[in-house]
Amino acid sequence: MAKATGRYNLISPKKDLEKGVVLSDLCNFLVSQTIQGWKVYWAGIEFDVTHKGMALLHRLKTNDFAPAWSMTRNLFPHLFQNPNSTIESPLWALRVILAAGIQDQLIDQSLIEPLAGALGLISDWLLTTNTNHFNMRTQRVKEQLSLKMLSLIRSNILKFINKLDALHVVNYNGLLSSIEIGTQNHTIIITRTNMGFLVELQEPDKSAMNRKKPGPAKFSLLHESTLKAFTQGSSTRMQSLILEFNSSLAI
């Protein structure tokens, strides 16, 4: 009697389903409060977001800082000395990083429509709103987004997180310390610091860096611990300490 088999399948349907991300996972940014901050669930990934470093960010912005921290303030004058810059929450920083990861994927890969358009919309939603749900109205997108495609998006976000982890602490021997991604309406800059990632969102022309007439900018800090669970970095605690002392950064 003939028997159906999946003998030559590389991934069994069961495993694919287990690892799969459904469209609703990409369109929901679920947040719950914890003692130290928040738990966030997005694209099948759970993030622990903490308040750590935020008090220091506010002190640098309001001139309430120790003289030893002046280098940090002078390194980012367009953030800390700009009357048109505003500090956002770490949840905002995570949203911007995830949006940047999607944009990075759109730049790196020739994704077919409607997938590219759908990802662009999800990226804009993360970047420009603080809502927890995005309503993907296009039925065609829902039909064509297979589990494999969604899982690919998730794995590429994790690859982007590892790209961030590979950055060096800013001001350390001139080594690469930032990732910059330009979209039609924004410039995203993510910089590695001692405490984690300084995330900034500027106008496309980066007018915030104009010293005479600085344009608007938003910024925040996402603590190192939030992304550490997803990285494959091999840096030891001792290497981290050396970087910390050599960089002389407050944040």
UniProtKB/Swiss-Prot annotation:
Signal sequence coordinates: none
GO molecular function list: structural molecule activity
Any single Gene Ontology cellular-component annotation: host cell endomembrane system
Xref: InterPro entries: Filo_VP24
Role noted for this protein: Prevents the establishment of cellular antiviral state by blocking the interferon-alpha/beta (IFN-alpha/beta) and IFN-gamma signaling pathways. Blocks the IFN-induced nuclear accumulation of host phosphorylated STAT1 by interacting with the STAT1-binding region of host importins. Alternatively also interacts directly with host STAT1 and may additionally inhibit its non-phosphorylated form. Plays a role in assembly of viral nucleocapsid and virion budding. May act as a minor matrix protein that plays a role in assembly of viral nucleocapsid and virion budding.
Annotated family: Belongs to the filoviridae membrane-associated protein VP24 family.
Subunit field text: Interacts with host importins KPNA1, KPNA5 and KPNA6. Interacts with host STAT1. Interacts with host KEAP1; this interaction activates host transcription factor NRF2 by blocking its interaction with KEAP1.
Keywords (A to Z) from UniProt: Host cell membrane, Host membrane, Host-virus interaction, Inhibition of host innate immune response by virus, Interferon antiviral system evasion, Membrane, Viral immunoevasion, Virion
Domain of life of the organism encoding this protein: Viruses
Keyword S-adenosyl-L-methionine tagged: no
Designated gene of the protein: VP24
Single GO BP term: symbiont-mediated suppression of host innate immune response
Source organism of this protein record: Zaire ebolavirus (strain Gabon-94)
Membrane protein topology class: Peripheral membrane protein
Compartments reported by the entry: Virion membrane; Host cell membrane; Host endomembrane system
Name under which the protein is recorded: Membrane-associated protein VP24
